[in-house]
Amino acid sequence: MVSQSSGRQDSPVDPWEGVSDDPGNTDGLPSLLDTEHPFCPSDIRFTRHRAAWINPPCAQQQLQDASPQVLAVGNRESHTASNTKSPLGTSPLSLGDSVVETSLPKGTTDSLGSSSAWGTAGNGSDSSVTLKEERAGLPRRCPHTSLITSSKTVSGPPCPEDGRAFFKPSQLTASADADAVQVGGRTVSSNSFSPEAFVLPVDAEKENAHFYVADMIISVMEKMKCNILSQQHTETWSTEEAGRSLGNSRADLEGTFYTHVKQESGSSTSSDSGYEGCVLQVSPVVETPTFSEVTEEDCKCDFDDFVIVELGDFSNTTEPCGCSSDTSKSVIHEPNFNSAELIAKELYRVFRKCWMLAEVHYQLTGSLDAAGSIVINEERVQKDFESSTDVVQEIKLKSRIRGTGDWAPPRFQIIFDIHPPLKRDLVVIAQNFFCAGCGTPIEPKFVKRLRYCEYLGKYFCDCCHSYSESCIPARILRMWDFRKYYVSNFSKRLLDHIWHEPIFNLLHVSHGLYTKAKELDRVREIQEQLFHIKKLLKTCRFAESTLKEFEQLPGHLTEALHLFSLEDMVKVKKGLLAPLLKDILKASLEHVASCELCQGKGFICEFCRSTAVIFPFQTATCRRCSACRACFHKQCFQSSKCPRCARITARRRLLESLPSAAT
């Protein structure tokens, strides 16, 4: 690094860094004995934080190996060897600071090495320094100092050989990531980090699974924040200013992304996620962004902070700047749009696109320095992605968030089958000698200590099975067996959770249970009567007191047929549910018999023409037509000659014949 003196022409160029012959002056600063160069109190070397000067030992060793050797030729002026500095000596910026390394062309390297000449005030030959600066890592605080992080071209006039002292470095190495420059017959590689430092542990994917999901969620949230900020800037700024800022930032975006890819090519693994190639995290910029750079930061948010892809089409993800204020594209209008499985699939699909595009962009940026250009067919990438295997299968193969390939925790599911009795050894072998609850490996000599769960049909360790007892739904539905069996802690929590839930429809699950359990069949008959009479009472304005009686029962017993919970079936077995249903039915029948509104809503049997009013809830003596839902006596009803169905058919034919007669 070279700093240019802009104050006086007679003052020689005072570089930042140098190598001194004085062993006491090892910090690379100008000698305190040199009174011609005043001390700059705002020098960035003194104002920068101390922690920024620390480099890893491998980087220090690399810089020490790359230190050039200084050749001193003559000394006829007042400058002594202690005041003479080499441009690439030991300094806080060279040894202690992790400065971003930048590739320099060969011509630039030669010019930089030849321009480090020292002139005298008597001859008046000042070194002219031409700086081409693309970006500055830190703001300038001192007029004598500058920090340049990109390529520089330094040229100086030829120094006459009449005794002037000059310093010429024998080597100058500047590389970025995997590049190496061969200078002075020696090849120096800047990638001195060992490959073992980036090798993940064997179980890193399993241990960091929650980080994997957390990074996905955080990335999507950061994308939403970026969209909101971009929308706010668009509303406040004018169209011309926004267009000018976007036009200026597009070129900077390409250069910045190229620099970031080169810097991160050695270590593309996120330090906290445990998986490779998913997130490119870059240290934040120190300088305060100006008004014209806000739009640039918004457009570069996908590359500076995290690689985030919008939940849209594949074509939208191929754009270099993925910032968009339209967040409605990521909204999925489906019945189960917020389910965990669907969200995981969507996140995996989007991030898989992101990984593929990251590789494409890396090849594109690498082709800028290559002799031949690399042609990337993005249509082929899209076709390969669409023709890949199912997303669900890829999730199972690449990352099993629920356990491992040999073990998975039990699922929250209702089991309606009774497990056949099997030998303990066979069941444990089927479990791969793992505890079904926590996945703890079990040695063969401790197999006898495992505890069996009657609900799941698997063996658990002592920590996952505390000998809790519960009724098994499959045994109740198949055998009307209410005995309690030992279940695991997981099964106990599951059964307690569904204990009051009406999820068992006996008509579909176990229709033959009514013939096995007589008390259940009697409850079904009363339930059917209450189902019809409750509908009638809801239409009567005088049945408020009677409807309050139904509040003693769960709503599903009087509003749906054949629907029970485990608690209801236990009450049926104990004989507690049938008496309660009979009391409510008795009160309802008394109201219907004495209410004129309810009597007016009854039916008259059209077969026997009896004056007695009949109702659908009288299931013992009445029957309803399945087509017109009319009510008749059971002994009088004939489905093939329903009078109401005949009238409806005749009326329909009459209506169909009227338009044809009018025409």
Swiss-Prot record:
A biological process from GO: autophagosome-endosome fusion
Polar residues biased stretches: 80-93, 105-130
Database matches in InterPro entries: Autophagy_HostDef_Reg (IPR052428), RH_dom (IPR025258), RUBC_PIKBD (IPR048569)
Region (Interaction with UVRAG): 196-235
Keyword match NADP: no
Topology relative to the membrane: Peripheral membrane protein
Post-translational modification: Acetylated by KAT5/TIP60 under autophagy induction, promoting autophagosome maturation and lipid metabolism. Lys-484 and Lys-574 constitute the key sites for tuning function in autophagy.
SMART domains: DUF4206 (SM01175)
GO cellular component: autophagosome membrane; cytoplasmic vesicle; intracellular membrane-bounded organelle
Gene Ontology MF, one: phosphatidylinositol phosphate binding
Keywords: Acetylation, Autophagy, Cytoplasmic vesicle, Lipid metabolism, Lipid-binding, Membrane
Known partners and oligomeric status: Interacts with UVRAG; the interaction is direct and promotes association with the PI3K/PI3KC3 and HOPS complexes. Interacts with STX17.
Function: Regulator of autophagy that promotes autophagosome maturation by facilitating the biogenesis of phosphatidylinositol 3-phosphate (PtdIns(3)P) in late steps of autophagy. Acts by antagonizing RUBCN, thereby stimulating phosphatidylinositol 3-kinase activity of the PI3K/PI3KC3 complex. Following anchorage to the autophagosomal SNARE STX17, promotes the recruitment of PI3K/PI3KC3 and HOPS complexes to the autophagosome to regulate the fusion specificity of autophagosomes with late endosomes/lysosomes.
Descriptive protein name: Protein associated with UVRAG as autophagy enhancer
Organism: Bos taurus (Bovine)
